[in-house]
Amino acid sequence: MARKAIIEKWSKTPKYKTRAYTRCRICGRPHAVLKKYGVCRICFRELAYKGEIPGCRKASW
């Protein structure tokens, strides 16, 4: 419940630009968000494994 309220609050335009911060578009997680994709590292990993992010491959060396 609290996370839903925070996501609703986050979706509004802040009074000052410095108050804005990145959140995951899927789960609302505030940490480890990849700006290019707009999702957190956990959701990014899941989407990459499903093949939903074009051009993304698992690295192995």
Curated annotation (Swiss-Prot):
Taxonomic superkingdom: Bacteria
Sorted UniProt keywords: Metal-binding, Ribonucleoprotein, Ribosomal protein, RNA-binding, rRNA-binding, Zinc
Signal sequence range: none
Binding site residues for Zn(2+): 24, 27, 40, 43
Gene Ontology, cellular component aspect: cytoplasm; small ribosomal subunit
A GO biological-process term: translation
GO molecular function, one term: structural constituent of ribosome
Family matches, as InterPro entries: Ribosomal_uS14, Ribosomal_uS14_bact, Ribosomal_uS14_sf
Entry-linked Pfam families: Ribosomal_S14 (PF00253)
Cofactor(s) of this protein: Zn(2+)
Keyword Phosphoprotein in annotation: no
Subunit structure: Part of the 30S ribosomal subunit. Contacts proteins S3 and S10.
HAMAP family: Ribosomal_uS14_2_B (MF_01364_B)
Function: Binds 16S rRNA, required for the assembly of 30S particles and may also be responsible for determining the conformation of the 16S rRNA at the A site.
Family: Belongs to the universal ribosomal protein uS14 family. Zinc-binding uS14 subfamily.
NCBIfam families: PRK08061.1
The protein's name in its UniProt record: Small ribosomal subunit protein uS14
